[in-house]
Curated annotation (Swiss-Prot):
Belongs to the QueC family. The lineage of its organism: Bacteria, Bacillati, Cyanobacteriota, Cyanophyceae, Gloeobacterales. Its EC number is 6.3.4.20. Keywords: ATP-binding, Ligase, Metal-binding, Nucleotide-binding, Queuosine biosynthesis, Zinc. Binds 1 zinc ion per subunit. Zn(2+) binds at C194, C202, C205, C208. It catalyses: 7-carboxy-7-deazaguanine + NH4(+) + ATP = 7-cyano-7-deazaguanine + ADP + phosphate + H2O + H(+). It is an enzyme of class 6 (ligase). GO terms for molecular function: ATP binding; ligase activity, forming carbon-nitrogen bonds; zinc ion binding. Its cofactor is Zn(2+). This is 7-cyano-7-deazaguanine synthase. One of its GO terms (biological process) is queuosine biosynthetic process. Signal peptide: none annotated.
Length: 234
């Protein structure tokens, strides 16, 4: 029986990865982290999406204030607001939380070991325009080797799958449509991406700008737009 563990935030990317895993594995488990993030509403979305997908198991791990940094996601720093993708800052986005994916993947590997699987799925993407160092394929491969050596004594024992790594946001939208089919609107409407923690998205934070652009470029209305305070169109 094939098992996989998904690092699952309840956002667009991890929802797509979880749906894809459900198609490819017999059992799909997920782990979601609470780290005092500003957008804690994503925890509710993670629970709702997990139930909608019928995940075999779903664990919520409370990290509390363990992760610190200057990122507005885990501090009182102001969250950047932008009118369009053209205004997004170059380099590493200020929302970067140092060590976040290192910690998430380490704990995920621990849980995967307990489940008897070496397959971990995570929705990181190099085309995400945020410049996060821990979303690059070179980082993921290094983590897989280190975790494999540290947990199994075998650098190849843990496989960290990154199905969205080379995809644009528009391509991720199209993949979601393909994988979820008739359930696309139902499931994606439950997802949450906005860093400001606004249901349906604030439309101005880094995450909202990229999600909106991806759906527009794909020519697909985002199911969460119906919750947006201001009307959104393609």
């Amino acid at each position: 029986m094939k098992k996989a563990l998904v690092v699952f935030s309840g956002g667009q990317d991890s929802t797509t990865c979880a749906a894809l895993a459900c198609r490819e594995y017999d059992e799909v488990h997920a782990v979601t982290f609470e780290y005092n993030q500003r957008h804690a509403i994503e925890l509710e979305s993670a629970r709702a999406v997990g139930q909608a997908l019928g995940l075999t198991g779903h664990e919520f791990i409370r990290l509390g204030p363990l992760l610190k940094g200057t990122s507005p996601l885990v501090s009182d720093a102001p969250l950047g607001q932008y009118a369009s993708a053209a205004e997004l800052p170059a380099g590493v986005e200020p929302t970067f939380v140092p060590g976040r994916n290192i910690l998430f993947l380490t704990l995920a590997a621990n849980r995967a070991f307990c489940l008897g699987t070496g397959d971990i799925v995570i929705g990181v993407c190099e085309a995400d325009f945020a410049g996060y160092w821990d979303c690059r394929q070179v980082f993921v491969e290094a983590m897989a080797r280190a975790l494999g050596e540290g947990i199994y004594g075998d650098a190849n024992a843990i496989r960290i799958h990154t199905p969205l790594m080379r995809l644009t946001k528009a391509e991720t939208v199209k993949l979601s449509v393909e994988v979820l089919g008739e359930r696309f609107e139902e499931v994606l409407a439950l997802s949450h991406t906005c860093y400001a923690g606004v249901r349906g998205g604030c439309g101005r934070c880094h995450a909202c700008i990229l999600r909106d652009r991806g759906f527009r470029e794909a020519g697909v209305p985002d199911p969460i737009w119906k919750f947006r305070k201001e009307p959104v169109s393609l």
